[in-house]
Amino acid sequence: MLGGNGYVEESGLPRLYRQAPLNSIWEGSGNVIALDVLRAMGRSSDTLAAVTAEIELARGADPRFDDAVKRLHTELGEIEGLPFRARRVAGLLALCLQGSLLLRHAPSAVADVFCATRLGGDWGSVLGTLPAGTDAAKIVERASIRAV
């Protein structure tokens, strides 16, 4: 391994390393981050209340979203063993918040595909598994940078 030199020298390989996601190096493992989310929620009841209030604003907009929110409340209600489920709970919390924001602020085609691929069905943890009939052009259009 190149160690620190792999990030600072000017050959092509270090550039690839620099462009790779470094969150696990900078912020610690995913489990540490998930446990920190639980710690923040435990410090003040206002923290979780604020996030769940934001999530609840989209209730009723999509049945897959509603099911995910129900699962989230179930996970949060089962205090026993919560640290062992920290990654799952933090991930579901993030997905529900993303879903709420997309359902309220994104074009319906974008929100629908998010709910289908992240909140419902059997997508697993693999990105890029879109359902048949997805209007990919609308998603790409939404992500495109436009001159103002």
What are these regions (language model features)?
Residues 1-148:
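Flavin-dependent oxidoreductase catalytic core characteristic
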